[in-house]
UniProtKB/Swiss-Prot annotation:
Role: Component of the cuticle of the larva of Tenebrio molitor.
Stretches the record annotates as Disordered: 38-80
Protein name: Larval cuticle protein A3A
InterPro entries reported for this sequence: CHIT_BIND_RR_consensus, Insect_cuticle, Insect_Cuticle_Struc_Prot
This protein's domain notes: The tetrapeptide (A-A-P-[AV]) repeats found throughout the protein are also present in many proteins constituting the protective envelope of other species.
Pfam families: Chitin_bind_4
Sequence repeats: 23-26, 111-114
Gene Ontology annotations for the cellular component aspect, listed alphabetically: extracellular matrix; extracellular space
GO molecular function: structural constituent of cuticle
UniProt keyword list: Cuticle, Repeat
Domain Chitin-binding type R&R stretches: 40-106
Length: 134
């Protein structure tokens, strides 16, 4: 019979594959467009935000004239002070900033406490407890 007889089986299966045709790369000429160069760039901008709903209060302004940039910005810090930063940048001195901090609300002037003179009450003697033993 067929029981116990060796059976020949292939070692693995593989699907045939197609090879893609490889073409040599083609050189494509690109046109180089030179960026416009401004030898003395200039700009100026600024904004101011005062939002009563969110409490957001900040502003900024900046100008550039050639290689010199000057500007400032301010905002309200979480502790309630206004921080203002004034800055300048140029090729000779680099970037420099000065920071100012100012309270938003003027400090309230508190008057010195009034000292009232009060007379001490008359002194009374405390009652003495007496114990009797029988």
């Amino acid at each position: 019979g067929l029981i116990g007889a060796p059976i020949a089986a292939p070692l693995g299966y593989a699907a045939p594959f197609a090879r893609a045709a490889v073409a040599a790369p083609v050189a494509v000429a690109k046109t180089v467009v030179a960026d416009e160069y401004d030898p003395h760039p200039q700009y100026s901008y600024g904004y101011d935000i005062q939002d009563g709903l969110t409490g957001d209060s900040k502003n900024q302004q900046e100008t550039r004239d050639g290689d010199v940039v000057q500007g400032s910005y301010s905002l309200v810090d979480p502790d309630g002070t206004r921080r203002t930063v004034e800055y300048t940048a140029d090729p000779i001195n680099g970037f420099n900033a000065v920071v100012h901090r100012e309270p938003l609300v003027a400090k309230a002037v508190v008057a010195a406490p009034a000292i009232a003179k009060v007379h001490a009450p008359l002194a009374y003697g405390a009652p003495v407890a007496k114990y009797a033993f029988h």
